[in-house]
Amino acid sequence: RSIKADFVVDATGAGQALVECGAIEADVALLQTRTRAIFAHVESLPMWNDLLVAANPNSIRHHPFVCDDSAMHHVLEEGWMWWLRFHDGLTSVGFVLDESRQPLNRNVSALDEWNELLAKYPSLNKAFRDAWLTHPELFRTERLQRMNRNVAGSDWALLPSTAGFVDPLHSTGIAHTLSGVERLTRILTRTSAGPDREHALSAYCRDISRETEWVDTLVHGCYRCLSDFRKFAAFSMCYFAAATTYERRRLDSSRENQPAFLCAEDEQMREAVSGLADAADQKTAVEFEKLCEQALRPFNHVGLFAPRHRNMYDYTALPDSDMT
């Protein structure tokens, strides 16, 4: 069966329908992050909040909300583990593993690797003691990252989730793709086939590629800091500074002049972040926290690094009077 269209938008994400046709060149070497995943759905996983309370009733007194109501991240030596709890009793769980710390060993089954990781962390092992997989097998990936050199042509375009993928750490995929939908909608509704549209699509291609590489910078730095949680938390503020600044600029901008995703076009922000990951290896945790706070100060609109928050924010759009 063949289908003809004047313009094709590939929204297949990892399916990469147009990419599979062979006309688009992949170039994952542009990305620094190298991670893989093992994941599944489970039932009867206890509430992490309840486990914390059982261990120490005072441990949650500063929590701004029940942690199980969020997309929970357990930061580990090899990477991190997600818990996404659904209302039907299922929980999506998975390890995202830094390949430099936990390379794929095909001689070890996915189940054995899963059990070895759980056994290494007593609190996680206890949580999964009575949980059970809803599918007989775990899913294990190879490298998660993908990147296409070309994102658009005269009669086709890839949405950001199809153009590339970095990592689920900061959950950027949906927001990035929606920003791409907005931009392609403007292009396709306001231009006709010809030079004007091709110029706009060329700019779209450049922007999406630059934004994906920027997400990679924000993610890769976090993985470099995994060995010290305080450094990891400090560098993660680069993402939150970029996200909150981007949201504010979107609100302040006209529909015709929207900022690049996560302020990827902001050279001052990129410069502020560029050397931080390297500095993490040379600084103590306290020194690195101060360095990150100083570098991000021009973009810190929501009280990031404020000691009273203890790295726990109920929301990141604090009133102007509540930012210290």
Protein language model annotation of sequence segments:
Residues 15, 21, 50-54, 93-95, ...:
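Generic alpha-helix signal with a bias toward terminal, lower-confidence helices
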